[in-house]
A protein has these predicted regions:
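Conserved AMP-binding A3 loop
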Residues: 63-67, 199-225
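Conserved AMP-binding/adenylate-forming core of the ANL superfamily
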Residues: 51-106, 123-128, 175-178
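Conserved pre-ATP/AMP-binding loop-to-beta segment of ANL
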Residues: 46-49, 165, 179-203, 210, ...
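Conserved AMP-binding/adenylation subdomain of ANL enzymes
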Residues: 222-242, 249-338
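Conserved small/polar residues in nucleotide/adenosyl-binding loops
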Residues: 1-7, 204, 342-346
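ANL superfamily adenylate-forming
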Residues: 58, 145-195, 304-344
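Structural core segment of the AMP-binding/adenylate-forming
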Residues: 5, 83, 110-175
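AMP-dependent adenylate-forming
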Residues: 12-19, 37-64
Length: 346
Protein backbone atom coordinates (compact mmCIF):
# COMPACT_ATOMS: atom_id res chain seq x y z
CA UNK A 1 0.00 0.00 0.00
CA UNK A 2 1.32 3.44 -0.94
CA UNK A 3 1.09 6.63 1.09
CA UNK A 4 0.91 10.14 -0.32
CA UNK A 5 1.04 13.58 1.30
CA UNK A 6 -2.00 15.78 1.18
CA UNK A 7 -1.63 19.21 -0.42
CA UNK A 8 -1.80 21.30 2.75
CA UNK A 9 -0.62 19.10 5.57
CA UNK A 10 2.40 17.04 6.33
CA UNK A 11 0.69 13.83 7.32
CA UNK A 12 0.82 10.94 4.91
CA UNK A 13 -2.57 9.57 3.97
CA UNK A 14 -3.09 5.99 2.79
CA UNK A 15 -4.44 5.26 -0.67
CA UNK A 16 -5.77 2.17 -2.34
CA UNK A 17 -3.03 2.31 -4.97
CA UNK A 18 -0.45 -0.45 -4.83
CA UNK A 19 2.74 -0.65 -6.85
CA UNK A 20 4.39 -3.85 -7.99
CA UNK A 21 7.58 -4.37 -9.95
CA UNK A 22 9.28 -7.44 -11.34
CA UNK A 23 12.81 -8.01 -12.63
CA UNK A 24 13.30 -7.26 -16.31
CA UNK A 25 14.05 -9.99 -18.81
CA UNK A 26 17.44 -8.45 -19.62
CA UNK A 27 20.12 -7.13 -17.28
CA UNK A 28 21.62 -3.63 -17.48
CA UNK A 29 24.53 -2.78 -15.21
CA UNK A 30 24.30 0.43 -13.20
CA UNK A 31 27.32 1.99 -14.93
CA UNK A 32 26.17 1.27 -18.49
CA UNK A 33 24.87 4.04 -20.73
CA UNK A 34 23.84 4.46 -24.34
CA UNK A 35 27.40 5.58 -25.04
CA UNK A 36 28.49 2.15 -23.79
CA UNK A 37 26.87 0.59 -26.87
CA UNK A 38 29.54 2.28 -28.97
CA UNK A 39 32.53 1.62 -26.71
CA UNK A 40 31.56 -2.02 -26.17
CA UNK A 41 31.32 -2.54 -29.92
CA UNK A 42 34.78 -1.04 -30.39
CA UNK A 43 36.14 -3.29 -27.65
CA UNK A 44 34.73 -6.33 -29.47
CA UNK A 45 35.47 -5.47 -33.10
CA UNK A 46 38.04 -2.65 -33.20
CA UNK A 47 38.00 0.75 -34.88
CA UNK A 48 38.15 -0.23 -38.55
CA UNK A 49 34.68 -1.67 -39.22
CA UNK A 50 32.05 0.44 -40.96
CA UNK A 51 29.37 1.66 -38.55
CA UNK A 52 27.51 4.35 -40.49
CA UNK A 53 27.07 5.97 -43.87
CA UNK A 54 26.22 9.57 -44.66
CA UNK A 55 24.51 10.55 -47.88
CA UNK A 56 26.66 12.69 -50.18
CA UNK A 57 24.31 12.82 -53.19
CA UNK A 58 21.55 10.87 -54.97
CA UNK A 59 22.52 7.24 -54.55
CA UNK A 60 25.97 8.22 -53.20
CA UNK A 61 27.29 7.38 -49.73
CA UNK A 62 30.38 7.97 -47.62
CA UNK A 63 31.27 5.20 -45.16
CA UNK A 64 32.21 6.01 -41.56
CA UNK A 65 34.30 3.63 -39.46
CA UNK A 66 33.68 2.99 -35.79
CA UNK A 67 36.92 4.80 -34.98
CA UNK A 68 35.93 7.94 -36.90
CA UNK A 69 32.41 7.90 -35.48
CA UNK A 70 33.84 7.60 -31.97
CA UNK A 71 36.29 10.44 -32.61
CA UNK A 72 33.46 12.72 -33.77
CA UNK A 73 31.35 11.78 -30.74
CA UNK A 74 34.16 12.61 -28.31
CA UNK A 75 34.99 15.86 -30.10
CA UNK A 76 31.35 16.95 -29.98
CA UNK A 77 31.14 15.92 -26.32
CA UNK A 78 34.13 18.12 -25.48
CA UNK A 79 32.53 21.01 -27.35
CA UNK A 80 29.30 20.60 -25.41
CA UNK A 81 31.24 20.64 -22.13
CA UNK A 82 33.13 23.76 -23.20
CA UNK A 83 29.84 25.45 -24.06
CA UNK A 84 28.70 24.79 -20.50
CA UNK A 85 26.38 21.84 -20.97
CA UNK A 86 26.37 20.07 -17.61
CA UNK A 87 25.03 16.76 -16.46
CA UNK A 88 21.25 16.80 -16.72
CA UNK A 89 21.18 19.91 -18.94
CA UNK A 90 18.75 19.80 -21.86
CA UNK A 91 19.83 20.20 -25.49
CA UNK A 92 17.40 20.22 -28.42
CA UNK A 93 18.02 18.59 -31.80
CA UNK A 94 15.59 20.13 -34.31
CA UNK A 95 16.45 18.21 -37.43
CA UNK A 96 15.49 15.58 -39.93
CA UNK A 97 17.25 12.22 -39.67
CA UNK A 98 20.90 12.64 -40.61
CA UNK A 99 24.38 11.51 -39.65
CA UNK A 100 25.10 14.50 -37.39
CA UNK A 101 21.95 13.70 -35.38
CA UNK A 102 23.44 10.32 -34.48
CA UNK A 103 26.81 11.79 -33.51
CA UNK A 104 25.25 14.44 -31.28
CA UNK A 105 22.89 11.93 -29.70
CA UNK A 106 25.80 9.77 -28.56
CA UNK A 107 27.83 12.82 -27.49
CA UNK A 108 24.98 14.00 -25.26
CA UNK A 109 24.56 10.50 -23.84
CA UNK A 110 28.28 10.23 -23.09
CA UNK A 111 28.37 13.32 -20.83
CA UNK A 112 25.02 12.83 -19.12
CA UNK A 113 23.19 15.62 -20.94
CA UNK A 114 19.55 15.23 -21.94
CA UNK A 115 18.52 15.05 -25.59
CA UNK A 116 15.18 16.84 -26.13
CA UNK A 117 14.33 16.27 -29.81
CA UNK A 118 11.83 18.45 -31.64
CA UNK A 119 10.00 16.95 -34.61
CA UNK A 120 11.33 18.41 -37.83
CA UNK A 121 7.78 19.36 -38.90
CA UNK A 122 6.96 21.24 -35.69
CA UNK A 123 6.05 24.91 -35.90
CA UNK A 124 7.95 27.65 -34.10
CA UNK A 125 5.21 27.80 -31.46
CA UNK A 126 5.41 24.04 -30.84
CA UNK A 127 9.19 24.19 -30.56
CA UNK A 128 8.92 27.15 -28.18
CA UNK A 129 6.70 25.22 -25.80
CA UNK A 130 9.00 22.19 -25.72
CA UNK A 131 12.16 24.28 -25.29
CA UNK A 132 10.71 26.29 -22.41
CA UNK A 133 9.02 23.34 -20.74
CA UNK A 134 12.25 21.31 -20.60
CA UNK A 135 14.64 24.21 -19.95
CA UNK A 136 16.76 23.78 -23.08
CA UNK A 137 19.97 25.85 -23.08
CA UNK A 138 21.38 24.87 -26.50
CA UNK A 139 19.61 23.96 -29.75
CA UNK A 140 21.00 22.43 -32.93
CA UNK A 141 19.09 22.54 -36.22
CA UNK A 142 19.90 20.88 -39.51
CA UNK A 143 19.25 23.70 -41.99
CA UNK A 144 18.59 27.41 -42.36
CA UNK A 145 14.80 27.06 -42.51
CA UNK A 146 14.59 25.39 -39.10
CA UNK A 147 17.30 27.68 -37.73
CA UNK A 148 15.17 30.68 -38.66
CA UNK A 149 12.14 29.02 -37.08
CA UNK A 150 13.96 28.86 -33.74
CA UNK A 151 15.57 32.25 -34.15
CA UNK A 152 12.09 33.79 -34.45
CA UNK A 153 11.23 32.59 -30.92
CA UNK A 154 14.63 33.10 -29.31
CA UNK A 155 13.48 36.16 -27.37
CA UNK A 156 10.64 34.12 -25.84
CA UNK A 157 12.94 31.30 -24.70
CA UNK A 158 14.89 32.79 -21.77
CA UNK A 159 16.96 29.67 -21.14
CA UNK A 160 18.04 29.17 -24.76
CA UNK A 161 21.58 30.53 -25.05
CA UNK A 162 22.59 29.57 -28.57
CA UNK A 163 21.39 27.94 -31.79
CA UNK A 164 23.80 25.98 -33.99
CA UNK A 165 23.18 24.66 -37.50
CA UNK A 166 24.45 21.37 -38.94
CA UNK A 167 24.63 22.84 -42.44
CA UNK A 168 26.75 25.58 -40.88
CA UNK A 169 29.26 22.97 -39.62
CA UNK A 170 27.92 22.62 -36.09
CA UNK A 171 30.12 19.57 -35.48
CA UNK A 172 33.20 21.51 -36.57
CA UNK A 173 32.26 24.43 -34.34
CA UNK A 174 31.85 22.15 -31.34
CA UNK A 175 35.13 20.40 -32.10
CA UNK A 176 36.93 23.74 -32.22
CA UNK A 177 35.30 24.86 -28.99
CA UNK A 178 36.24 21.61 -27.29
CA UNK A 179 40.02 21.89 -27.69
CA UNK A 180 40.10 23.63 -24.31
CA UNK A 181 38.61 20.56 -22.58
CA UNK A 182 41.12 17.94 -21.43
CA UNK A 183 40.73 14.21 -21.92
CA UNK A 184 40.67 13.85 -18.14
CA UNK A 185 37.70 16.21 -17.80
CA UNK A 186 35.83 14.37 -20.52
CA UNK A 187 36.54 10.98 -18.96
CA UNK A 188 35.32 12.25 -15.59
CA UNK A 189 32.02 13.32 -17.14
CA UNK A 190 31.64 9.96 -18.89
CA UNK A 191 32.38 8.10 -15.65
CA UNK A 192 29.78 10.21 -13.81
CA UNK A 193 26.96 9.10 -16.14
CA UNK A 194 24.98 6.02 -15.15
CA UNK A 195 22.16 3.78 -16.30
CA UNK A 196 19.46 5.48 -14.25
CA UNK A 197 20.37 9.00 -15.36
CA UNK A 198 17.93 10.77 -17.64
CA UNK A 199 18.87 10.29 -21.31
CA UNK A 200 16.07 12.02 -23.16
CA UNK A 201 12.71 13.75 -22.90
CA UNK A 202 10.48 12.80 -25.81
CA UNK A 203 7.34 14.86 -26.28
CA UNK A 204 4.06 13.43 -27.47
CA UNK A 205 2.60 14.72 -30.72
CA UNK A 206 -0.01 16.87 -28.98
CA UNK A 207 -2.85 15.65 -31.17
CA UNK A 208 -5.14 15.20 -28.14
CA UNK A 209 -3.87 18.09 -26.02
CA UNK A 210 -0.68 19.90 -25.08
CA UNK A 211 2.44 17.75 -25.73
CA UNK A 212 3.63 15.82 -22.68
CA UNK A 213 7.30 15.19 -22.03
CA UNK A 214 8.17 11.54 -21.41
CA UNK A 215 11.38 11.04 -19.42
CA UNK A 216 13.47 8.04 -20.45
CA UNK A 217 16.69 6.87 -18.81
CA UNK A 218 19.68 5.11 -20.32
CA UNK A 219 18.45 1.91 -18.68
CA UNK A 220 15.07 2.26 -20.42
CA UNK A 221 16.64 2.25 -23.87
CA UNK A 222 19.35 -0.32 -23.10
CA UNK A 223 16.71 -2.74 -21.86
CA UNK A 224 14.68 -2.60 -25.06
CA UNK A 225 17.82 -2.77 -27.21
CA UNK A 226 18.95 -5.97 -25.53
CA UNK A 227 15.45 -7.38 -25.69
CA UNK A 228 15.53 -6.53 -29.39
CA UNK A 229 18.72 -8.53 -29.86
CA UNK A 230 17.06 -11.53 -28.25
CA UNK A 231 13.82 -11.29 -30.23
CA UNK A 232 15.14 -10.01 -33.57
CA UNK A 233 18.73 -11.21 -33.57
CA UNK A 234 18.59 -12.60 -37.11
CA UNK A 235 17.53 -9.17 -38.40
CA UNK A 236 19.60 -6.88 -36.16
CA UNK A 237 22.81 -8.88 -35.77
CA UNK A 238 23.25 -11.64 -38.37
CA UNK A 239 24.67 -11.57 -41.91
CA UNK A 240 26.12 -8.03 -41.93
CA UNK A 241 22.94 -6.06 -41.21
CA UNK A 242 22.47 -2.76 -43.03
CA UNK A 243 19.77 -0.32 -41.92
CA UNK A 244 18.54 2.50 -44.13
CA UNK A 245 17.07 4.91 -41.59
CA UNK A 246 14.70 7.64 -42.72
CA UNK A 247 12.05 7.73 -40.00
CA UNK A 248 12.44 10.78 -37.72
CA UNK A 249 14.90 10.24 -34.88
CA UNK A 250 12.64 12.39 -32.73
CA UNK A 251 10.55 9.21 -32.45
CA UNK A 252 11.59 6.51 -29.95
CA UNK A 253 11.10 3.81 -32.60
CA UNK A 254 13.86 5.20 -34.82
CA UNK A 255 16.13 5.89 -31.83
CA UNK A 256 15.70 2.31 -30.65
CA UNK A 257 16.65 0.81 -34.01
CA UNK A 258 19.61 3.20 -34.36
CA UNK A 259 20.95 2.01 -31.00
CA UNK A 260 20.42 -1.62 -32.01
CA UNK A 261 22.50 -1.11 -35.15
CA UNK A 262 25.28 0.88 -33.48
CA UNK A 263 25.53 -1.67 -30.68
CA UNK A 264 25.71 -4.75 -32.93
CA UNK A 265 29.05 -6.16 -34.04
CA UNK A 266 28.92 -5.08 -37.69
CA UNK A 267 25.66 -3.20 -38.21
CA UNK A 268 25.72 -0.19 -40.53
CA UNK A 269 23.27 2.73 -40.34
CA UNK A 270 22.62 4.73 -43.49
CA UNK A 271 21.16 8.08 -42.41
CA UNK A 272 18.65 9.33 -44.98
CA UNK A 273 17.32 12.90 -44.44
CA UNK A 274 14.36 12.44 -46.81
CA UNK A 275 12.79 9.94 -49.19
CA UNK A 276 12.82 12.09 -52.34
CA UNK A 277 15.27 9.70 -54.03
CA UNK A 278 14.33 6.61 -52.07
CA UNK A 279 14.52 4.11 -54.95
CA UNK A 280 18.08 4.97 -56.05
CA UNK A 281 19.08 5.18 -52.38
CA UNK A 282 17.73 1.67 -51.81
CA UNK A 283 19.62 0.36 -54.83
CA UNK A 284 22.90 2.00 -53.84
CA UNK A 285 22.85 1.37 -50.08
CA UNK A 286 21.44 -2.18 -50.32
CA UNK A 287 19.80 -2.38 -46.86
CA UNK A 288 19.08 -5.78 -45.35
CA UNK A 289 16.16 -4.33 -43.39
CA UNK A 290 14.09 -1.16 -43.24
CA UNK A 291 12.13 0.72 -40.63
CA UNK A 292 9.15 2.33 -42.27
CA UNK A 293 5.51 3.28 -42.26
CA UNK A 294 2.91 2.14 -44.82
CA UNK A 295 3.12 5.29 -46.96
CA UNK A 296 6.83 4.68 -47.62
CA UNK A 297 6.29 1.15 -48.88
CA UNK A 298 3.28 2.33 -50.89
CA UNK A 299 5.55 4.87 -52.55
CA UNK A 300 8.00 2.14 -53.61
CA UNK A 301 5.20 -0.15 -54.80
CA UNK A 302 3.42 2.56 -56.78
CA UNK A 303 6.64 3.70 -58.46
CA UNK A 304 7.41 0.13 -59.53
CA UNK A 305 3.85 -0.38 -60.73
CA UNK A 306 3.94 2.78 -62.85
CA UNK A 307 7.26 1.77 -64.38
CA UNK A 308 5.88 -1.68 -65.27
CA UNK A 309 2.98 -0.08 -67.15
CA UNK A 310 -0.18 -1.81 -68.35
CA UNK A 311 1.18 -4.25 -70.94
CA UNK A 312 2.98 -7.54 -70.50
CA UNK A 313 5.36 -6.13 -67.88
CA UNK A 314 2.41 -4.76 -65.96
CA UNK A 315 0.70 -8.15 -65.91
CA UNK A 316 3.93 -9.82 -64.79
CA UNK A 317 4.32 -7.24 -62.02
CA UNK A 318 0.76 -7.81 -60.81
CA UNK A 319 1.31 -11.59 -60.84
CA UNK A 320 4.58 -11.22 -58.92
CA UNK A 321 2.92 -8.97 -56.33
CA UNK A 322 0.10 -11.47 -55.84
CA UNK A 323 2.62 -14.30 -55.54
CA UNK A 324 4.50 -12.34 -52.86
CA UNK A 325 1.31 -11.77 -50.87
CA UNK A 326 0.40 -15.46 -51.00
CA UNK A 327 3.94 -16.46 -50.06
CA UNK A 328 3.89 -14.13 -47.05
CA UNK A 329 0.49 -15.31 -45.82
CA UNK A 330 1.48 -18.96 -46.16
CA UNK A 331 4.77 -18.41 -44.35
CA UNK A 332 3.03 -16.58 -41.50
CA UNK A 333 0.59 -19.47 -41.17
CA UNK A 334 3.45 -21.97 -41.03
CA UNK A 335 2.34 -23.80 -44.18
CA UNK A 336 4.06 -24.91 -47.35
CA UNK A 337 4.34 -22.58 -50.30
CA UNK A 338 2.13 -23.51 -53.22
CA UNK A 339 2.72 -20.44 -55.36
CA UNK A 340 4.41 -21.22 -58.68
CA UNK A 341 6.92 -18.89 -60.26
CA UNK A 342 6.85 -18.48 -64.03
CA UNK A 343 9.58 -17.36 -66.38
CA UNK A 344 9.15 -16.08 -69.88
CA UNK A 345 11.39 -15.16 -72.75
CA UNK A 346 8.81 -12.69 -74.09
Amino acid sequence: EMCIRDRVGTAAVPTIISEYTSPGDVAVNDDETLYSLLTERIARTGNATTIAARKTGPGAWSSITTGEFHRLVLAAAKGLIAFGVGKGDAVTLFSATRFEWGVLDFALAAIGAVNVPVYDTDSAAQAERIINDSGVKLAVTDNRERYDRLDSINDRCPGLQRILMMDGNALGALEGLGVSVSDEELEARIADTHADDLATIVYTSGSTGAPKGVELTHRNFLSVVRAGYECLGEVLCDNHPRLLLFLPLAHCFARFIQYCSIGSDDGVVGYLPDTKSLLPDLRSFKPTYLLGVPRVFEKVYNAASRKAGTGFKGRMFAQAAQCAREWSRTEQDGGKHSCLLYTSDA
